[in-house]
Amino acid sequence: GPVGLLSSPGSLPPVGGAP
């Protein structure tokens, strides 16, 4: 997901709870 927004493989860091 978007960086720093969602806990998805594309998020760094994975912040949030949406996949």
From Swiss-Prot:
Entry's Gene Ontology cellular component terms: extracellular region
Using the UniProt record, give the first listed, main subcellular location. secreted
Please indicate which superkingdom the organism of origin belongs to. Bacteria
Location in or out of the cell:
Secreted
Transmembrane helix among keywords:
no
Known function? Has antimicrobial activity against P.wickerhamii and against Gram-positive bacteria B.subtilis and B.megaterium as well as Gram-negative bacteria X.campestris and P.solanacearum. The synthetic peptide partially inihibts growth of fungi P.capsici, V.dahliae, F.graminearum and F.omysporum.
- What is the protein's given name? Antimicrobial peptide GP-19
Native source species: Xenorhabdus budapestensis
